[in-house]
Amino acid sequence: MAQVYTNKSFKSLVSITLMAAVLGLTACSTSTESNPDVQARQDTMKNWGDAMGVMGDMAKAPDTFDSEVFKEQAAFLAEDAAKPWSHFEDPEAVGNATEAVWSNADEFRAEADNFQKVTAELSATAQTATSMDDVKPAFGQVGASCKSCHTDFRAKTE
């Protein structure tokens, strides 16, 4: 019989992770303008959502934790974390971004920097992880980073 986890922080971690994955996938499923910058950043974030989904599945079912797969997904995020930010330079390439990306560029840059930091920390932690418990805090930080940026800089969709 499957073990039911009632740990409140674990439930929050799973919720944040799933929300980040859904937001990432939603960003890519909406109509993209014919702007290559919009397409590039949405493609990148869809890939991030896919990686978060793989790791999130392990978070939901810790007995399925596969250290090699988790390590691979975490390394991908860390290596790819700097990729989309240059595609936000043109304020005409709006896509699902809010005007705050450009009007509050310093805070947006801080969010991007934080994402790069927490994905690097997750990747480093994953290198020696033997269970989901080992990576849970770092994984939660990545999910929180996604959520924070999407809350402030992603247009709400209906």
What name fits each language-model region?
Residues 1-2, 90:
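Short regulatory "switch" loops immediately downstream of catalytic or recognition motifs
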Residues 2-17:
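Bacterial N-terminal signal peptides that target proteins for export
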Residues 14, 21-27:
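C-terminal segment of classical bacterial N-terminal signal peptides
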Residues 17-20, 79:
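A generic structural signal for short, solvent-exposed coil/turn residues
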Residues 26-67, 75-158:
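Sequence context surrounding c-type heme c attachment/ligation sites in exported
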Residues 71:
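Conserved catalytic core of two-component sensor histidine kinases
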